[in-house]
């Protein structure tokens, strides 16, 4: 990973990527850790069906995805689920009904930068299908699909493919 070259402290072109986790300046004592970003993915279910969203932006535009996104500073994973489902699908959910399932590491490639993420997977079961209003800047289509009809080749991210391999 060599996206950064210049040290923000001394301005020399001396940053080196080390140990697959940090940039260190060879001229001064500056160190920048590239820690994992937390992200959530919510498996919205109704009976044996799963709600999938089709991505309307890169990375993986046109691939199927679970609703979710990055955790903002000072935000819990559960609140991230609430916020993302409201933003993307206009769904109001109760955090008491969220069920944590598992997590997987992932790499999110965006505008030439690789972001290491830790994707936290939750399940939210709904009693009745309701009208879903998708955020069209992020989502081009939504689809309810039976669990046994899911095709991993159509899933956007490796972490979600690994999740579905274990979950299904």
PLM features: what roles do these ranges have?
Residues 17-18, 92-103:
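A short coil-to-beta-strand element that immediately follows conserved catalytic motifs
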Residues 15-16, 33:
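Short functional micro-motifs and their immediate structural scaffolds
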Residues 102-131:
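Active-site-adjacent beta-strand/loop module that shapes the phosphate/pyrophosphate-binding cleft
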Residues 45-87:
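Conserved Nudix-box catalytic region and its N-terminal flanking loop in Nudix hydrolases
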Residues 27-51:
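Conserved N-terminal beta-strand and adjoining loop/helix that marks the start
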């Amino acid at each position: 990973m060599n996206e950064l070259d210049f040290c923000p402290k001394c301005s020399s072109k001396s940053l080196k990527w080390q140990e697959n986790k940090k940039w260190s300046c060879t001229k001064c004592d500056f160190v920048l850790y590239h820690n994992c970003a937390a992200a959530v993915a919510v498996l919205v279910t109704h009976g044996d069906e799963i709600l999938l969203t089709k991505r309307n932006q890169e990375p993986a535009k046109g691939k199927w995805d679970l609703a979710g996104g990055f955790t903002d500073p000072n935000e819990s994973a559960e609140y991230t689920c609430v916020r993302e489902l409201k933003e993307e699908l206009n769904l109001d959910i109760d955090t008491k009904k969220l069920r944590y399932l598992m997590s997987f590491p992932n790499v999110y490639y965006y505008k030439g930068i690789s972001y290491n993420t830790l994707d936290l997977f939750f399940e939210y079961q709904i009693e009745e299908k309701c009208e879903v209003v998708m955020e069209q800047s992020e989502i081009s289509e939504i689809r309810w699909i039976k669990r046994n009809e899911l095709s991993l080749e159509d899933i956007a991210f490796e972490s979600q493919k690994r999740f579905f391999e274990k979950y299904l």
